Amino acid sequence: MLSSGDLTSASWELVVRVDHANGEQQTEITLRVSGDLHIGGVMLKLVEQMNIAQDWSDYALWWEQKRCWLLKTHWTLDKCGVQADANLLFTPQHKMLRLRLPNAKTVRLRVSFSAVVFKAVADICKVLNIRRPEELSLLKPSSDYCKKKKKKEKNSKEPVIEDILNLESSSTSSGSPVSPGLYSKTMTPTYDPINGTPALSTMTWFGDSPLTEQNCSVLAFSQPPPSPDVLADMFQPRSLVDKAKMNAGWLDSSRSLMEQSIQEDEQLQLRFKYYTFFDLNPKYDAVRINQLYEQARWAVLLEEIDCTEEEMLIFAALQYHISKLSQCAEIQDFATKSEVDEVEAALSSLEVTLEGGKADNTLEDITDIPKLADYLKLFRPKKLMLKACKQYWFVFKDTSIAYFKNKELEQGEPIEKLNLRGCEIVPDVNVSGRKFGIKLLIPVADGMNEVYLRCDHEDQYARWMAACILASKGKTMADSSYQPEVISILSFLKMKNRNSSPLVASSLENMDMNPECLVSPCCAKKHKSKQLAARILEAHHNVAQMPLVEAKLQFIQAWQSLPEFGLTYYLVRFKGSKKDDILGVAYNRLIRIDAVTGIPVTTWRFANMKQWNVNWEIRQVAIEFDQNVSIAFTCLSADCKIVHEYIGGYIFLSTRSKDQNETLDEDLFHKLTGGQD
């Protein structure tokens, strides 16, 4: 039997630093412990020895050397590997964090620094009333963004005072009750479906939320357009490599903030990371739709995504319209049934476009798949000649296009048959120039087969473009999303029509806009202010009757129709290659892009992926596809874990369905994205 002296010799001293509330200086507590003492016992000893009456329930032990939390309170010190030289910190798990939202507003709230980022983001979104938190994540600003900000502050004569929405009283504790209104399927709208005004009757749902006290319209309403000076001072990517650098800062969703060296009160960005916006609904998504609109708006203004001048003017007109409606003091707190129906119709179209599921449950007659047949012009850039554009008779059926010398030869062998499943579809449209083109990038063994189709008018273009988009996803024109896609394309083309009318001239005289605030700096430099304003007002004529929420949805849909939409770029080096390439990650595919020319080289579909993994020793991502195709690459602009998580994240999001009642399989997410490091 051991004597008391033996017991004393088996124990040892453990020094623990303690964080105190209200910014008081840390204190060091020395405990006498033994290896069989569990973590909960250590914390109990600490509290008893300090003898300070306060709530210690949020405190936990953080191990500095191992950079990990000791959250399994039933584990012993021996099992954890804690010895006398361990540097332990007894600190709150929830700390203040500043989050810059997509609308450029900063909120300050209490966030769990011990939960994995995936869970922390879900809790943050509950506080902010944003559904589908799995689409968002936290981004550490790039060094280029920070340098621009510091330079601006240095050159400023006055101190920069940031407008912060302080939600300090809120807690994102995982166990805290959340208002059922956030996820209720039967609740009435949380805000007016037309003008976006929060409905007073619904504010009772958020009685415990700090947003009630601080006017949640700050998050649900769009912000005024930024001044040209503000735009000029912000970081704008000039190349695909610059865009790749912007995506290096995504946090690891499988690790906590503390494990990733995030400090208390540090500023991070909350962003939509995955471009699959599921189940958007104006009844419940006031904040979500507005933040999505704001992220799209800033992406256009800062040229994070390329668009034509014609498209830029459409975006400017929609911004102008949304800004006017948002600032209108006479907005009424009611909506007519017809107005609600308009928004629901716009939403239904948007939902189909964004892969949110079918618009209705009507069973299609799949025994008779529709076909398109018409004369179109064909152009192949690789056979570059002055008269390379030639007219053929085209037949579109299933997911393939065949073309013939003329209509009479349709029953014979086609000149060529193009299978569009898995191809890239790029619009090439200039409405004012009567140019309606469709660029097809079709994957072949040695890269991409580039083909241009030229249509004669809007209706023809809308039908063929919609068919191409569906075929690229493996769907036919029998799918219920075909007609909404056609309508959506026609609607967007209608917005692009220029209207030079006396009304525009009179509006110009009473102009209340600064046009340079509504377009990118590069676009603003090309035109005089009055000329730019006139063109924006011409475009505005086509959207002037839109309700506020529909205008935001149209902006999102126009953003979604841009060729670069949904692509996240990374600088990589493919195995066996001697030069760097850009890897584009989208919701359903990977694209290898030439870093110099920006031209897509090869596309690989997730649907054809058999497996992917990471060699953590050499930080190399390896992916195996059908037909014995395999690729491997190292990431140069970011950690390979970020790209690995993007691939797994998109596959995870593809498993969502409306029947799930918004419950997420968090274990599946970590299984697909966590890796084996």
From Swiss-Prot:
Q: Can the keyword Heme be found in this entry's annotation?
A: no
Q: Does the keyword Lipid biosynthesis apply?
A: no
Residue stretches of biased makeup (Low complexity): 169-181
| Gene Ontology MF, one | actin filament binding
For this UniProt entry, what's an example GO CC term? Answer: cytoskeleton
**Which positions bear Phosphoserine?**
170, 179
- Which membrane topology describes this protein? Peripheral membrane protein
Where the record annotates domain PH, the positions are 377-473
* SUPFAM superfamilies from the UniProt entry: PH domain-like (SSF50729), Second domain of FERM (SSF47031)
Q: What pairs make up the disulfide bonds?
A: none
Tell me the compartments it is located in.
Answer: Cytoplasm, Cytoskeleton; Cell junction, Focal adhesion; Cell projection, Ruffle membrane
Query: What InterPro entries does UniProt report for this protein, alphabetically?
Result: Band_41_domain, FERM_2, FERM_central, Kindlin/fermitin, Kindlin_2_N, PH-like_dom_sf, PH_domain, PH_Kindlin/fermitin
Q: Region labeled Disordered — which residues?
A: 157-181
Q: Name one Pfam family in it.
A: Kindlin_2_N
The record's annotation in PROSITE patterns points to: FERM_2, PH_DOMAIN
Phenotype upon loss of function: Mice are born with the expected Mendelian distribution and appear normal at birth, but fail to thrive, become dehydrated and die after three to five days. They develop skin atrophy and die due to a lethal intestinal epithelial dysfunction. The colon is shortened and swollen and presents signs of acute inflammation. At the time of death, about 80% of the colonic epithelium is detached.
> What is the documented function of this protein?
Involved in cell adhesion. Contributes to integrin activation. When coexpressed with talin, potentiates activation of ITGA2B. Required for normal keratinocyte proliferation. Required for normal polarization of basal keratinocytes in skin, and for normal cell shape. Required for normal adhesion of keratinocytes to fibronectin and laminin, and for normal keratinocyte migration to wound sites.
Could you tell me what this protein is called?
Fermitin family homolog 1
Q: Which organism is it from?
A: Mus musculus (Mouse)
